[in-house]
Regions:
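Membrane-associated alpha-helical segments
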Residues: 184-310
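General N-terminal leader/first-domain-start detector
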Residues: 1-15
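Cytosol-facing regions at membranes
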Residues: 64-67, 209, 238, 245, ...
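Alpha-helical transmembrane anchor segments
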Residues: 288-342
């Protein structure tokens, strides 16, 4: 019985070794079927395995068939390749052929010609070929995401240009609305960053594995044919570079949005400081006016008090004159006026 919780396992299917491996993002199945050296036909999947895979056909990332043959009596055209690529691998101990044309069921075919490899080295070399194709397909999954994101980035760039022009126009009365628009754009950019970061990171990791496995093949030319590694790199590197460029574009956009927000925040802060300074100046002017008014009121109060005192003394001296003291009110007021005024 299969242990479904294990990371990998080996069993037998129709009497043939059947290996399965669980990876982080995908699941691999490897079936080894012996065949005679004279057989030039590509083997079909056993019915049991084909029926098991059929319901999951839409989720199949990559299907590769490797046919192993000896170099003696090789007739390459019999294997149905059209303009194949070929490479000597393992320091010339084996030759690999493929035209990278998918069959009707989506299978990519490799013809592996073993010259001087033992079983262990042959297995390692075939495994590298399988990993190259698997990792290449896994890395290419991000291309659809990158294309969709690129269209969104075009719209975000236009929005950022519009907001930058509004900010440069000095529309101080609309600073709040401008800040809200920048915050909304920032949220959208951050959302796209969070959603795509894992996928872009996976693409870089898978691409690095592809190039490492290609280097481990130690390829050399077979006649005038294009090497497998050259064929793969010419078609795979643009995908990797496009994804990397899209990721960098997203990161740069996030920085530009953040910088615009910081600049606007600084401008709003300066405007608020200027408003506060104006309010303080207004308060100081009002305080000065109140001090002047208070001084004027105090001066008027002194005049009024002096006037009342003089009238009071006038009545007093008038009464004393009536009593016969010989001091008229006028003389008394003249004598008292200086100290009263002081």
């Amino acid at each position: 019985a299969l242990d479904t919780t294990a990371a990998q396992g080996i069993t037998r299917l129709d009497g043939h070794p059947f290996k399965w491996e669980r990876h982080t993002e995908f699941f691999t199945l490897t079936l080894v079927v012996p065949c005679t050296a004279a057989d030039t036909d590509w083997q079909a999947l056993p019915p049991v395995l084909a029926e098991a895979i059929a319901p999951q056909a839409a989720q199949v990332i990559n299907a590769v068939q490797v046919l192993v043959r000896d170099e003696q009596g090789l007739d390459l055209p019999q294997y149905g390749f059209k303009d194949p690529c070929g490479s000597c691998v393992g320091g010339g101990d084996a030759v690999v052929w493929s035209d990278f044309r998918l069959t009707e069921d989506g299978t990519n075919r490799f013809l592996f010609i073993n010259r001087r490899l033992n079983a262990y080295r042959q297995g390692r070399m075939i495994r590298r070929l399988l990993e190259i194709e698997t990792y290449r397909m896994m890395a290419s999954l991000t291309l659809t995401t990158a294309k969709a994101l690129s269209q969104e980035l075009d719209a975000f760039d236009k929005t950022l240009v519009t907001l930058s022009e509004r900010s440069a126009g000095g529309e101080g009365h609309d600073s709040k609305g401008l800040l809200e628009a920048i915050a909304h754009l920032s949220r959208q950019v951050v959302s796209r960053t969070v959603k795509t970061r894992h996928r872009f990171g996976a693409t870089q990791a898978y691409a690095q594995l592809v190039f490492e496995r290609l280097g481990e093949l130690r390829e050399s030319h077979v006649g005038d044919c294009q090497r497998l590694g050259v064929f793969i790199e010419r078609r795979f590197k643009p995908t990797v570079r496009y994804c990397a460029a899209t990721e960098q574009r997203l990161e740069q956009l996030a920085k530009n949005v953040a910088n615009l927000g910081d600049l606007l925040q600084a401008r709003v802060q300066v405007e608020m400081e200027e408003q506060n300074a104006g309010i303080l100046r207004s308060l100081n002017a009002r305080a000065d006016a109140q001090v002047k008014i208070q001084r004027a009121v105090e001066g008027l109060s002194i005049i009024a008090i002096t006037y009342y005192l003089l009238n009071l003394f006038k009545l007093l001296y008038g009464g004393l004159n009536v009593l016969g003291l010989g001091l008229t009110a006028r003389d008394g007021l003249l004598a008292m006026a200086p100290p009263v005024l002081l």
